[in-house]
Amino acid sequence: MADVEDIQPLVCDNGTGMVKAGFAGDDAPRAVFPSIVGRPRHAGVMVGMGQKDAYVVDEAQSKRGILTLKYPXEHGIVNNWDDMEKIWHHTFYNELRVAPEEHPVLLTEAPLNPKANREKMTQIMFETFNAPAMYVAIQAVLSLYASGRTTGIVLDSGDGVSHTVPIYEGYALPHAILRLDLAGRDLTEYMVKILTERGYSFTTTAEKEIVRDVKEKLAYLALDFEQELETTKTGSAVEKNYELPDGQVITIGAERFRCPEVLYQPSLIGMEAAGIHETTYNSIMKCDVDIRKDLYGNHVLSGGSTMFPGIADRMSKEIQALAPSSMKIKVVAPPERKYSVWIGGSILASLSTFQQMWIAKAEYDESGPSIVHRKCF
């Protein structure tokens, strides 16, 4: 095998909703596709179609009528390893078109990922894909690196889960990490519900994808929710049109800001949970009093569900209301935050100082999967 230094590492960020994959040193992922595996609903239906037992991604999307679609990752944690393996196989061979046995692989994991899961990821990379080296990094930590910081608190909110992760000098503080099972998928479901109240019906998986697009293109966060609702009663300033694939045009108004408001008021969907602002505050309060100032001053947003216009101003306002009055608060919403986990991985894997951090195949062969706890933390 050639020297590890000469070979570009692969970076793969497996989200609940989307896989982001590419090469270390690049400034954006080369491949972004849904974390979906489709399996035939009825044995025999697919006869003569090459008889695959599983389809990934676009194939799954296009044949969705006869396939059952499954997301192998749930709330950020992998729960179906066979399907996850299919997704990695597709990532390496079809999307990136590389031989994984020739590249070190950096994978990402959710904060508080169970130990057994980290071991399983490690085992699959070395035993199934014969990777020469691998590493597992916490998603929120990578987002913080991507913002050019090593200390701060990250709110990472994707499709399946949100976390608040305080990080001090590059290390996540596990006792203060909080998880909120409220994220993009719940917002899409809520948008479906409130559009139904307007008389628009979206029921199939395909139609829900349309609603996800409506959400991504038109939703925003109000600085003051009640005031925004009052404004919409008197005029049509917030109304926007959206053309459906069949040419029908729908109009949406208050739904635009009612949908993401759930992040701050989970009770809107009947959830008994603190909103993202309060969860962030609770995370900070679990940290040593001496570092709180650094956390308040470096609050970084990351993940697709932080892409709503207005989120940074709203977050500042809400945290300001909870924090001590003299505290200086800074909320950072980098424009590339949808991919900042991946970008942080790309940066980390290309650092010369990182090269001694990889778990090498030889170390794995000697120690087994538990090596991951000693080398990745």
UniProtKB/Swiss-Prot annotation:
One of its GO terms (molecular function) is hydrolase activity. SUPFAM superfamilies: Actin-like ATPase domain (SSF53067). It holds the Pfam family Actin. GO terms for biological process: cell division. One of its GO terms (cellular component) is cytosol. Keywords: ATP-binding, Cytoplasm, Cytoskeleton, Hydrolase, Nucleotide-binding. There are at least 13 actin genes in potato. Gene3D superfamilies: 3.30.420.40, Actin, Chain A, domain 4 (3.90.640.10). The gene is AC71. Its EC number is 3.6.4.-. It comes from the Eukaryota. It catalyses: ATP + H2O = ADP + phosphate + H(+). InterPro entries: Actin, Actin/actin-like_CS, Actin_CS, ATPase_NBD. This is Actin-71. It is found in: Cytoplasm, Cytoskeleton. Actins are highly conserved proteins that are involved in various types of cell motility and are ubiquitously expressed in all eukaryotic cells. Essential component of cell cytoskeleton; plays an important role in cytoplasmic streaming, cell shape determination, cell division, organelle movement and extension growth. Belongs to the actin family.
